[in-house]
């Protein structure tokens, strides 16, 4: 297979399985020599912020001299971004070879059991674990797909577990309450393994407290055990002070905006420090400073054009939209235009309501390239917004009607990805 055929093969697997357990991926991993049982891992979950935190953790540990694998989803520009080593995406040739190897293992299993198969995410996760072992990374930072306990990534014993926050999202899979969702996410907490979390809402904190009581895990919580006592905008980024029991690190800079990124970066620092302590690896304040300064993360309040001023953001649930609105009010004193595309399996009504209440000009558009896109009929019910056939049409209307207003495109990482690929290069 060539590269295009390889990516098409990966996407040919079913998206969901009838049962949410680890039997399929463990069977495939066993056929690959159980790479997930070898090496060191950091496991990261959370409704929002897990990608930003995982990215920053990897950058900080890379700055300390470690070779770091990073497994995330979804990709923004190219599939290869999902499996990176020292922030270099897996090369095309390496991806082709790795997929061929994992495919051969899968086909051997299917010769023994004709109806055996895995989901797309299970295949990619097994691929990531195998590739990281082949490249002998020092540590791999693994971002959960959805939830935690039954997620395909949850087949490892990490050095440290991370839970950024708990909010309502993926309710059909995880449940309709904070408590239910928190129980899924707390499923990555392992016996005796430290866990670093955000300042969780009370219902989620109660779940984690009960979990660590049974696992005997050390629990390090934002705003209790570590904090950001001081922060301010610094260009299109932030400068802040981090504090924990070891003292303060001042004037840290990160190229990310939004108050919630202060929490994510603090979680990343604390996680890296816990990892270093657990593995007796030297980690200096300068490593932390250098790693955070490099922690750009695409499609997270990312400015992709100055003239016109265009920002893309992957906020995809009501909690994420709340954080986005707060950040935009801090960033801009003038009116802004919002272009929002939301998936049908999200709480699109609440998201659209919050955006239209906060901003006078909101265009609603379909998310391209995914069967999960909200159909036009769903948008028509949201009468406050202006329905457009595409984000390109909404962008053109905004540039024509209010050419001097900043434009923010949000609602889904899939939409942010499509916009970024088109405006910054890649497929149209």
Curated annotation (Swiss-Prot):
Protein purpose: Involved in the conversion of folates to polyglutamate derivatives, and likely functions in the retention of cellular folate pools. Catalyzes successive MgATP-dependent additions of glutamate to a pteroylmonoglutamate substrate, with a high preference for 5,10-methylenetetrahydrofolate (mTHF). Thus, metabolizes mTHF to the tetraglutamate derivative, but longer glutamate chain length products are not observed. Tetrahydrofolate (H4PteGlu) and 10-formyl-H4PteGlu are poorer folate substrates. In contrast to E.coli FolC, this enzyme does not display dihydrofolate synthase activity.
Binding positions for ATP per the UniProt entry: 49-52, 264, 300, 313-316
Any one of the GO BP annotations: one-carbon metabolic process
Activity across pH: Optimum pH is about 10.
Cofactor: Mg(2+)
Keyword Transport tagged: no
UniProt record similarity statement: Belongs to the folylpolyglutamate synthase family.
Keyword annotations: ATP-binding, Ligase, Magnesium, Metal-binding, Nucleotide-binding, One-carbon metabolism
Source organism of the structure: Lacticaseibacillus casei
One of the Pfam families matching this protein, by short name: Mur_ligase_M
Gene, per the UniProt record: fpgS
GO terms under cellular component: cytoplasm
PROSITE patterns assigned to the protein according to its UniProt record, in alphabetical order: FOLYLPOLYGLU_SYNT_1, FOLYLPOLYGLU_SYNT_2
Stated name of the protein: Folylpolyglutamate synthase
Note: In contrast to many bacteria such as E.coli and Corynebacterium spp., L.casei cannot synthesize folate de novo, and requires exogenous folates for growth. L.casei metabolizes folate to polyglutamates of chain length up to 11, with octa- and nonaglutamates predominating.
Effect of residue 316 to A: Loss of activity
Oligomeric and partner information: Monomer.
Cofactor, free-text remark: Binds 2 Mg(2+) ions per subunit.
Catalytic activity of the protein: (6S)-5,6,7,8-tetrahydrofolyl-(gamma-L-Glu)(n) + L-glutamate + ATP = (6S)-5,6,7,8-tetrahydrofolyl-(gamma-L-Glu)(n+1) + ADP + phosphate + H(+); (6R)-5,10-methylenetetrahydrofolyl-(gamma-L-Glu)(n) + L-glutamate + ATP = (6R)-5,10-methylenetetrahydrofolyl-(gamma-L-Glu)(n+1) + ADP + phosphate + H(+); 10-formyltetrahydrofolyl-(gamma-L-Glu)(n) + L-glutamate + ATP = 10-formyltetrahydrofolyl-(gamma-L-Glu)(n+1) + ADP + phosphate + H(+)
């Amino acid at each position: 297979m060539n590269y295009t055929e390889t990516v098409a093969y990966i996407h040919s697997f079913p998206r969901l399985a009838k049962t949410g357990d680890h039997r399929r991926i463990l069977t495939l991993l066993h056929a690959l020599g159980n790479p997930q049982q070898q090496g060191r891992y950091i496991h990261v979950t959370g409704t929002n912020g897990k990608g930003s935190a995982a990215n920053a953790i990897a950058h900080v540990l890379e700055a300390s001299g470690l070779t770091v694998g990073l497994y995330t989803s979804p990709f923004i520009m190219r599939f290869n971004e999902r499996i990176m080593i020292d922030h270099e995406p897996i090369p095309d040739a390496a991806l082709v070879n790795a997929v061929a190897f994992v495919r051969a293992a899968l086909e051997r299993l299917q010769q023994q059991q004709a109806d055996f198969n895995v989901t797309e995410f299970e295949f990619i996760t097994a691929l990531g674990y195998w590739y990281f072992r082949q490249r002998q990374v020092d540590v791999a930072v693994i971002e959960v797909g959805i939830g935690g306990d039954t997620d395909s990534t949850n087949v490892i014993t990490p050095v440290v577990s991370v839970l950024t926050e708990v909010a309502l999202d993926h309710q059909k899979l995880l449940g309709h309450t904070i408590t239910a969702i928190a129980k899924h996410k707390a499923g990555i907490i392992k016996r005796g393994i430290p866990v670093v979390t955000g300042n969780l809402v009370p219902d989620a904190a109660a779940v984690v407290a009960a979990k660590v009581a049974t696992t005997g895990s050390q629990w390090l919580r934002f705003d209790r055990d570590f904090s950001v006592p001081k922060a301010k905008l610094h260009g299109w980024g932030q400068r802040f002070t981090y504090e924990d029991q070891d003292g303060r690190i001042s004037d840290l800079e990160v190229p990310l905006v939004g108050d919630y990124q202060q929490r994510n970066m603090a979680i990343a620092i604390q996680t890296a420090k816990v990892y270093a302590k657990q593995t007796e690896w030297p980690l200096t304040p300068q490593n932390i400073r250098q790693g955070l300064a490099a922690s750009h993360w695409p499609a997270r309040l990312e400015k992709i054009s100055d003239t016109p001023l265009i920002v893309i953001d992957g906020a995809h649930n009501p909690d994420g939209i709340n954080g986005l609105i707060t950040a935009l009010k801090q960033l801009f004193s003038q009116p802004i235009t919002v272009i929002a595309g939301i998936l049908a399996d999200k709480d699109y009504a609440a998201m659209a309501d919050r955006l239209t209440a906060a901003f006078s000009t909101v265009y609603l558009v379909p998310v391209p390239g995914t069967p999960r896109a909200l159909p036009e009929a769903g948008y028509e019910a949201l009468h406050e917004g202006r329905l457009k056939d595409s984000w390109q049409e909404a962008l053109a209307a905004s540039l024509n009607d209010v050419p001097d207003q900043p434009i923010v495109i949000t609602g889904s990482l899939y939409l942010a990805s499509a916009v970024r690929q088109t405006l910054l290069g890649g497929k149209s």
